[in-house]
């Protein structure tokens, strides 16, 4: 298997219907936020939400700001689904087979749907890990926080698979592009198919990248590493 993506799909048509069902003022307000995030995907969802809320309501207290933001969590789903769709469409329409493991991918619209090979529905975490292990490249699309990572990235590395993902500040700090990870840009998705082909056509380079990714993740990004950090944080609180 050349390339896998382990994630569910939420159709943009369904999300658009939810937006259309809103009152006019809310629909316009939420549309501005999603358009802002799509226009500049490097922004974090919380920062953009806060900016738009304060522009609309002025100097609101922190409690009201938090309450307003908690009711807008679906915006992350909207933007994430938009880019998941765009990424898979871009690859499939360029002739690259994408094996997707998750719900509802049969609903995606693209010019070459035969290149989107589905698992037939939801799969459990063990099946996702096995899919990564069986693949040469594991694709990721980050959630809309911009100073963290998704476990898909490190799970792929720990299976000895090359990780291909959009970036974040944290991932840039932890990883080296082209050495132990491969970054693509949501602002330049037209370059993504060439990145995939370049990796697949150079199996030695890809294997070396995957091996370096494995060594880095095995040393720094297993769950026991996170448990150690949490235990240290708890000890610091008790001091």
Segments (PLM) and residue ranges:
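A structural signal for alpha-helix termini and helix-coil/disorder junctions
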Residues: 9-12, 93, 97, 202, ...
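Nucleotide-sugar donor-binding catalytic core of glycosyltransferases
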Residues: 1-146, 168-170
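Catalytic binding pocket for nucleotide-activated donors in carbohydrate/polymer assembly enzymes
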Residues: 78, 103-238
């Amino acid at each position: 298997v050349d390339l896998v993506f382990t994630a569910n799909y939420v159709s943009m048509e369904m999300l658009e219907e939810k937006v259309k069902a809103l009152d006019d003022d809310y629909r316009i307000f939420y549309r501005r936020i999603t358009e802002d995030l799509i226009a500049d995907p490097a922004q974090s969802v919380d920062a953009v939400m806060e900016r738009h809320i304060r522009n609309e309501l002025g100097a609101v207290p922190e409690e009201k700001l938090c309450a307003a933001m908690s009711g807008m969590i679906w915006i992350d789903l909207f933007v994430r689904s938009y880019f998941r769709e765009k990424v898979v469409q871009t690859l499939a329409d360029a002739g690259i087979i994408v094996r997707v493991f998750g719900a509802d991918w049969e609903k995606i619209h693209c010019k070459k749907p035969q290149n989107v090979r589905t698992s037939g529905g939801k799969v459990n975490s063990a099946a996702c890990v096995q899919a990564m292990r069986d693949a040469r490249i594991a694709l990721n699309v980050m959630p809309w926080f911009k100073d963290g990572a998704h476990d898909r990235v490190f799970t792929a590395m720990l299976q000895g698979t090359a990780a291909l993902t959009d970036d974040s500040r944290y991932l840039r700090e932890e990883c080296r592009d082209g050495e132990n990870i491969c970054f693509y840009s949501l602002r330049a998705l037209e370059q993504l198919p060439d990145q995939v082909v370049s990796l697949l056509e150079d199996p030695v380079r890809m294997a070396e990248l995957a091996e370096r990714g494995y060594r880095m993740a095995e040393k720094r990004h297993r769950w026991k590493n996170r448990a150690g950090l949490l235990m240290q944080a708890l000890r610091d609180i008790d001091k």
